[in-house]
């Protein structure tokens, strides 16, 4: 099991040797620091705490500064706990080289917030009839409709109603690693990842392994060689 913290840079595209364009997400993955070791003897489970992206020390309280000082590192902005991770030491660095092209990962982040939205946009409900008494503006066409049986005297839990859309924890599963750039600390994944640019992401080894398929052969300009993800 592998895991690391990163930040979304944006999206781009790469071309295969057959000329097919592949949409890719570029993720910045700096050196992660192990800032805490959690053992089963003390906390009833095994885990490690990773931290990344420096932040001004003046923004932290003294106990927080002392927590990072134990790992001999500067205060970090993004901190996450990874369960069932063993074999790490306090203060150890983890970088993008733990992954290799062809592997599959799960990426967790916070989706883009879209503000207040109605049920048609939020839950993909159908629009009401525009004739036979359903006209008269957008209200009767786009309204929520029935909220349940009147004898219950309540709105049942889970009823689809208008509210805030987006800004939720989302996980994209089984994304293929197309390229690992160790020099620039970048990870290139096939497809999209949650959240806007500069949003923080948690990257872990994929739980659901996809069916084996042919590796992606990338086209490299000014070169006769193929780059295969094996």
UniProtKB/Swiss-Prot annotation:
Q: Which UniProt keywords apply?
A: Ribonucleoprotein, Ribosomal protein, RNA-binding, rRNA-binding
Q: List the disulfide bonds.
A: none
Segment Disordered: which positions?
125-149, 210-230
Q: Which GO terms describe its biological process?
A: translation
Q: Please verify whether the record's keywords include rRNA-binding.
A: yes
Q: Does the keyword Membrane apply?
A: no
GO CC list: cytosolic large ribosomal subunit
Annotated Gene Ontology MF terms? rRNA binding; structural constituent of ribosome
Q: What does the annotation say about its assembly with partners?
A: Part of the 50S ribosomal subunit. Forms a cluster with proteins L14 and L19.
What family is reported? Belongs to the universal ribosomal protein uL3 family.
The protein's matches in HAMAP family, at most eight in alphabetical order, are given as:
Ribosomal_uL3_B (MF_01325_B)
Summary of the function given for this chain in its UniProt record: One of the primary rRNA binding proteins, it binds directly near the 3'-end of the 23S rRNA, where it nucleates assembly of the 50S subunit.
This chain belongs to the protein called: Large ribosomal subunit protein uL3
Organism this protein belongs to:
Mesomycoplasma hyopneumoniae (strain 232) (Mycoplasma hyopneumoniae)
Gene that this sequence comes from? rplC
């Amino acid at each position: 099991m592998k895991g690391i913290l990163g930040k979304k840079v944006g999206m781009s595209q790469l071309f295969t040797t057959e000329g097919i364009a592949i949409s890719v997400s570029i993720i910045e993955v700096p050196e992660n620091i192990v800032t805490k070791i959690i053992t089963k003897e003390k906390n009833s489970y095994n885990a490690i705490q990773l931290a990344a992206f420096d932040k001004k020390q003046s923004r932290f309280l003294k106990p927080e500064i002392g927590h990072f000082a134990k790992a001999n590192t500067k205060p970090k902005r993004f901190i996450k706990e990874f369960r069932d991770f063993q074999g790490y030491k306090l203060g150890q660095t983890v970088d993008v080289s733990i992954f290799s092209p062809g592997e599959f990962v799960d990426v967790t982040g916070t989706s883009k917030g879209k503000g207040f939205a109605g049920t048609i946009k939020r839950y993909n409900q159908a629009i009401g009839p525009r004739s036979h008494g359903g006209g008269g503006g957008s209200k009767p066409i786009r309204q929520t409709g029935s909220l349940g049986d009147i004898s219950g005297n309540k709105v049942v839990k889970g009823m689809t109603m208008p509210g805030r859309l987006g800004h939720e924890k989302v996980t994209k599963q089984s994304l293929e690693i197309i390229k690992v750039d160790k020099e620039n600390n970048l990870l290139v994944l096939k497809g999209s990842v949650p959240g806007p640019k500069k949003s923080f992401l948690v990257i872990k080894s994929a739980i659901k392994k996809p069916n084996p398929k042919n590796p992606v052969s990338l086209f490299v300009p000014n070169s006769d060689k193929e780059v295969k993800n094996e």
